[in-house]
């Protein structure tokens, strides 16, 4: 039994098909079938029930699946550590971040980092905070930028932004000249929301329900600039972070502080507590922490 046997076994179990596993791994189906058969003979057990083209794990197969995942994870961690030793200052970092902050301060941070580590490459994945947390959780991303809260049992984190949400309306809106606005005043308004895979979707929905109403959502999007454009076309209202509002055209939209309640928008960088981070990822975290982190932002209260 070797790592290749376990890799083939896990892929067949995941896809429930020898054919699909062979396509995924770019090897012939007979090769995979032979590997699995050899593994079963070596262990003296059946790992799969064969039912035509569909395969299912046996009870022994389920136990094997759990253990094989841990073995592969440990092997990958070992490989990463050895690569660090052999290839210092080289690597690839996968970062997930919400679309609304991608063009903000991160190009500057990445640019400065590249001056010191020119051989480190990056994959930037723009998505809502919920999906970013899932990506860091399942290992498809190394590091994530998310809207808090994040699961403190799973992730390390440090806070980089502490702001609140602001109301954005058309200049002709009845509230356009107000100094501040209470959330309950918006109960009859058409809302333009972020999608459900954004933390702000659930955050705003929860606060509206607490204020005594369920918001009338006419559009959902993943892009903050779409929200501002829809508001400027007088098609609805939006709630956006202060950082975004500072860049909006005051001739097209009006920004009003939202009070009672104040809805926080806190951004943090997260990474898994139980997963090995490559040299490149650790170096980027340290660089970003020195660049963006303010210890006061992580203080309680």
UniProtKB/Swiss-Prot annotation:
Alphabetically ordered keywords of this record: DNA-binding, Transcription, Transcription regulation
Entry GO MF terms: DNA-binding transcription factor activity; sequence-specific DNA binding
Segments of the chain annotated as binding DNA: 18-37
Pfam family, one: LysR_substrate
Record domain HTH lysR-type: where: 1-58
Listed GO CC annotations: cytosol
Protein origin, superkingdom: Bacteria
GO biological process: regulation of DNA-templated transcription
Gene3D superfamilies: 3.40.190.290, Winged helix-like DNA-binding domain superfamily/Winged helix DNA-binding domain (1.10.10.10)
InterPro entries given in the database record: HTH-type_LysR_regulators (IPR050950), LysR_subst-bd (IPR005119), Tscrpt_reg_HTH_LysR (IPR000847), WH-like_DNA-bd_sf (IPR036388), WH_DNA-bd_sf (IPR036390)
PROSITE patterns, alphabetized: HTH_LYSR
Cited PANTHER family: HTH-TYPE TRANSCRIPTIONAL REGULATOR YBHD, NITROGEN ASSIMILATION TRANSCRIPTIONAL ACTIVATOR-RELATED
Family as reported in the entry's similarity comment: Belongs to the LysR transcriptional regulatory family.
Name recorded for this polypeptide: Uncharacterized HTH-type transcriptional regulator YwbI
